[in-house]
Amino acid sequence: MKIVREALAGTQESSDLMVKIAPADGELEIVIHSEVIKQFGDQIRQVVNETLHALAVRQGLIIVEDKGALDCVIRARLQSAVLRAAEEQPIDWSKMS
């Protein structure tokens, strides 16, 4: 999916996260800020990468402000933000699990 506009999803509340997406030329840039980065940073990055790969996002700036969200919340917030920021196109719902 091509990112064409800025979008937000999520909150700054405990056990949630805020995802900010913006269009950018070049490669995909992912920035993760988390209160639990030392314990779960690798897992958070893996979930973010897998979700973006499943949605075929190859360019853009993705900023994740995590407050201890579970993997399912990370996926849901990323999916919401990407769909808000992407070009209008048919969605393959089978890729969103």
Curated annotation (Swiss-Prot):
The keyword Cytoplasm appears for this protein: yes
GO cellular component terms attached to this protein's record: cytoplasm
Keywords, alphabetical: Cytoplasm, Phosphoprotein
Pfam families: ACP
Highest rank taxon of the organism: Bacteria
Modified positions (O-(phosphoribosyl dephospho-coenzyme A)serine) in chain numbering: S14
Subcellular location: Cytoplasm
Subunit note: Oligomer with a subunit composition of (alpha,beta,gamma)6.
NCBIfam families: citD, PRK13253.1
Family: Belongs to the CitD family.
Protein function: Covalent carrier of the coenzyme of citrate lyase.
Protein name: Citrate lyase acyl carrier protein
